[in-house]
Every structure is written in C-alpha cells, then in structure tokens.
A protein has these predicted regions:
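Start-transfer (signal-anchor) and selected internal transmembrane alpha helices
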Residues: 1-29, 122-123, 226-227, 489-503, ...
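Transmembrane signal-anchor helices characteristic of membrane glycosylation enzymes that use polyprenol
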Residues: 9-40, 131-133, 234-245, 510-514
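Extracytoplasmic catalytic/substrate-binding loops of multi-pass membrane glycan-assembly enzymes
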Residues: 30-50, 59-77
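Loop-to-helix entry region of an early transmembrane alpha helix in multi-pass inner-membrane enzymes
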Residues: 68, 72-76, 83-101, 125
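Transmembrane-helix motifs of polytopic, lipid-linked glycan transferases
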Residues: 87-117, 156-160
C-alpha cells in the first residue's frame, strides 16, 4: 500500500498562503494595543514621542537625556505606518508573515529533490508553523515598543543568510544577491532597532560568510564571493545614515549617547570602584557612590537627586535593596544630570561625562579610589565568575521558557492607562485601538465574547505548539548528534557539511541569545524570565526542529539496505 503524500499545485500553494496570511491578520484584528501614559517614559512613550517628531520633520525632537539613549529604528517604522495610514498591530503581523514566508522559502532547498508538488506542502507547513507561532502574538507585541518588530527583523536576517548558504551549495546556478540583500535588510534594521542586536546577529553573519566563502572560493565563483559584502554594506549604510542624522541635529556622530561614547565610559569607570556591598544587581552601590562623590567634584551636584530627591528615588530605587539596581542606576543618574542642566545640548553632555570618566579612571589608576576591574567602556555589569552559576541556571530556565511557549497569552491582563485625550492622540497616530475599557466594577480590561473566544482558541493552539516544539527540538538535537556516529557519518562534502553547520549555528545562536538575556537578568534586571527578550529564540527553534527532523530524523535508504542484507 502506497503512503499518502499530499501535493500542492503552484496556484493552490499561493492561494493557501494568502488564506493563512488573512487568517493570521484576522487574529491580530481581535487584539488591542496597550499603553500606560506616564508609566513608560523610557520605553513606549520615548518611541511614540520620537515618531511624532519624525513625522513633523524634526528628526528625534529636542535634545534631552532620552533623545539618543536607544536605537531609534522603531520610531521610523511608526512614522512610516502613520504616513501610509496603516494600523500598527496589523502591520506588525504582516511584517512577521513576510519574514515567515521568506524563511520557509530559504529552507525549501533542503527538499529540492522531492516532487515539486510535495515540496510545496513542506514549504507551506514551515510557513504556517512560523506565521502562527504563539510568541508572535504574545502580550509584549501589544506594546508600542521596538520588540513588536524586532523578532521579525531578526528572522529576515537569519532567513536571508540561510537561503544564501543553502543555495550556494545546492543550486549554484541561481544568484545569491537577493538572499544577501534580505539578510542585509534584516541585519541593518535589527541593528538599528536594538542596541544588543549586533551581539548575536554579527557572530552568525561572520560564521556564515566564512563558511560560504570557503565553498565559493573552492568553486572559483568570484562574483558570488564578492557579493558576500552586501549585508555588511547595507549595515554600514544604515548606521552611517542614522549617525549622520544625529550629527546634523545634535552634533554627535553616533547611534546612541548611552551605550557608546562618553556616558558608557563614565559608567564603566564608576563600576570599576570597589565596594563592600555583596547584594545582587548593584553596579554602583551606595558606598561606591560616596567614594566617587568625594573624588569627583563634578558629580556632587547629582548627589542630591540620587540620594535625597524623593521622586527620583521612587522612580528608580529598589525598596527591597534600598539602592539602585544596575538596570535602573544609569537612567537615574542621567535624569539627575538632566535636572542639573547637563543635557542642555549633546556636546555639553558629552564633555561632562568624558570628564567624569577621565577623573574616576585616573583616581583608580593612581590608587586614590579602590578598583575591582580594569578600564571599561560599557553600561553593563562586568562579567565575573560569580555570575557564571546563576547565568547558566537562568539560561536553562530561559531555554525551557521558550520551549514551553510560556507567557504567550494574546491579550494584556492590565488595562491601558491614560486620559481620553491621550487615547485619542495615540489611536489617531497609530490607527489602532487600545484596551482602555474596563469590566463593570473592576479595573481590568474588557474584552468582548468574540475576543474571548478567539483568545481561547489561540491559547489552545499555544498548548499544542508547546508540546510539538519541545518534542521536535529534543528529537532534532538527538538526530543531529547521531549524524556524528561512524555508522551514520556521510562523506564530508559541502552538501553534507553546510546544512549540518547551518543547523548547529541556528541552535547555537539560540542558546547564545538565552545566555545573553540570562546574564542581564541575573546581573542587572531581576525581573524574571521574559518572553519579550527571548522572542527571537522561538522562530530559531522552530526552524531547527523542522529542518533537523526532515534532514536527520528519517532512516536513509542505505540504512534499510544494510538491515535487509
């Protein structure tokens, strides 16, 4: 009896793709955005403010301590949607569907030997698995914040690099530049969307480029080899564009005056100063600050705000630790500097923080201030052996958090906060509604019976996906490792090695992202495992499980022949 093998014509494939996209967008249509006006000045409100300034032709607006504090591609995205009159949530879902479809086509080369009609079924299946991935509609996507689009931008990058690598090996007659351009767009936009993007996108890009370059050089495909610079050129153009705009408007040739430059140097210098405090999460504890105030007169005016001002301490100080967590201290000291007029303009702020950095470093080098590290230019905590156990434990927790698709509810349990004028302004600009209505007699958001029904279906799908993803990833790991066994090892050619390395790289970069977020969590934040920060990992594990099981999860014909013999 022949096995049932589903097949799809080209027309049926595209019709089903269109239907799946419509269904995915329809699900998002039941969702409502969430804001807390006055409660997120460093995040959602900063992005919304910048987007409005871009729309008004003022770039990021008047300079203050927040203007250049974060990567600012997301406000550009919001301004673009506003100009095109596109709804915010629907547009984010459409961007995700585009990334999912690109990723499905990128990996379709792996089933090139199948009948085309059968191959389309696999491509459609991978697209559906990614398009309806529950992390893509989780509550964090309902915020007006950069993580609404960051996972999609990263998926464009990974899909482009994977599509390029596989076609370089299996279909040398096809051009690589479209895939490299897609990877470059994802790399540039992702890098400009979050400051930490380069830490896990660039290692993957570098490894993929080197491996493919070896293959192309061996085949003397010099034009394809030269095209490998496309993603890096696009990244350079994007960075140069933003830096030029910042220099034109503020006199600072940088993407950010927070994560780079003199402020990062000042924070790195402050974290050099030794402390007797052993409490977790503290980068510059109170006893270290007292030593710094005495050694650096320029910081004395900020001492009042940091140590005495009730409002600033209420906003940033941790009452349980009675001090500033690392993830809050740098915002607190920047706001204190704002109150003292240091952020009157970018050049004044740059000169001030450079003076602070130079004096602290000089005092540490001279032994006037006790120090625990060498010179650093960073806003993150210094990596030390003390963080290794907790980071590994949190990496493990984060990995299982992703596999279990935890915290992927498609609605926000908190009600949006703001005045009627606030909601009118935000809704008018974003063309999206907010969950501002409350249940009778409660301060919880009201959702209609239709919304609740749809949300229940989406959560049911999440439970199914969590099981499939967990089993799929674990089986894919075992099957890929089994390929290293002598009895299954194939002849080492580009067609066997490159796919294996690609999947190994995807899984490895997923673990790297978990470890990155784990370190920040245990050293600075202490907010618990976050789906928002791990949302780039979910699609990578879907790709790994799907492609890994397809490549290595079935017995080969040669294996069957050996058994029969």
């Amino acid at each position: 009896m022949k096995h049932f093998r589903p097949r799809l014509s080209r027309r049926a494939f595209w019709v089903l793709c269109a239907l799946l996209v419509c269904l995915r967008l329809a699900l998002t249509g039941f969702q409502q955005a969430y804001i807390w006006v006055g409660g997120a000045p460093l995040d959602d409100e900063l992005m919304f403010r910048a987007a409005n300034h871009i729309t008004a032709g003022q770039w990021l607006g008047a300079y203050d301590y927040l203007t250049l504090s974060k990567a600012m591609f997301f406000p550009v995205w919001l301004a673009l949607l506003h100009v095109l009159h596109l709804p915010y949530l629907i547009s984010g879902a459409a961007l995700w569907c585009g990334a999912a479809l690109l990723a499905a086509f990128a990996f379709s080369t792996l089933w090139r030997k199948k009948d085309p009609a059968q191959g389309r079924v696999l491509t459609l299946g991978l697209f559906a698995a990614l398009a309806f991935l529950p992390s893509s509609w989780a509550a964090y996507t309902l915020r007006v914040y950069r993580d609404n689009i960051f996972p999609a931008l990263c998926l464009y990058f990974f899909a482009g690099m994977a599509g390029m690598a596989l076609r370089a090996v299996f279909t040398p007659e096809r051009p690589l530049w479209p895939w490299l351009a897609a990877a470059g767009a994802g790399l540039a936009c992702g890098y400009l969307d979050r400051e930490d993007a380069g830490l896990f996108l660039l290692p993957f890009a570098a490894a993929a480029t080197v491996i493919v370059a070896v293959v192309l050089a061996g085949k003397r495909r010099w034009k394809a080899l030269a095209a490998q610079v496309i993603p890096y050129v696009m990244l350079g153009v994007g960075v140069l564009t933003f830096c030029t705009l910042n220099y034109t408007h503020y006199g600072v040739f940088a993407l950010s005056d927070f994560s780079e430059g003199s402020f990062a140097a000042a924070m790195g210098a402050m974290m050099r100063v030794d402390t007797d405090n052993t409490a977790p999460y503290l980068s510059v504890p109170a006893d270290a600050r007292e030593k710094i105030y005495d050694a650096v007169p320029e910081l004395e005016p900020l001492a009042y705000w940091l140590e005495e001002d009730a409002q600033l301490q209420n906003d940033f100080r941790d009452p349980n630790l009675d001090d500033y967590r690392a993830g809050s201290f740098y915002w607190a000291i920047r706001r204190a500097a704002q109150f003292e007029g240091i952020y009157a303009d970018a050049k004044t702020a740059d000169a001030y923080w450079q003076t602070v950095a130079d004096k602290i470093n000089a005092a540490c080098d001279a032994g006037t201030l006790p120090n625990r590290t060498g010179r650093r230019v960073a806003t993150s905590q210094p990596i030390s052996a003390a963080y290794v156990p907790s980071t590994l434990a949190e990496t493990w927790n984060g990995f299982w958090h992703v596999l279990g698709l935890r915290d992927c509810a498609p609605y926000e349990t908190l009600r949006s906060i703001g005045t009627e004028d606030d909601f009118a302004a935000w809704s008018g600009y974003l063309h999206s509604g907010f969950n501002s209505a409350a249940n009778a007699g409660e301060d919880t958001p009201y959702y209609s019976p239709y919304q609740k029904t749809v949300f229940a279906v989406m959560q049911g799908w999440t439970r199914v996906c969590s099981i499939l993803l967990t089993v799929g990833v674990l089986c894919a790991v075992l099957c890929q490792l089994a390929e290293l066994l002598p009895q299954r090892r194939q002849k080492c050619t580009a067609q066997t090695v490159v796919p294996w390395l690609l999947l190994f790289g995807i899984f490895g970069i997923a673990l790297l992202r978990c470890a990155m977020i784990a370190f920040v969590e245990v050293s600075s934040f202490g907010i618990g495992t976050s789906t928002m920060y791990l949302a780039t990992v979910h699609p990578l594990l879907v790709l790994y499980a799907f492609a890994g099981l397809l490549l290595y999860g079935r017995p080969r014909k040669t294996d069957k022949r050996r058994e029969n013999a």
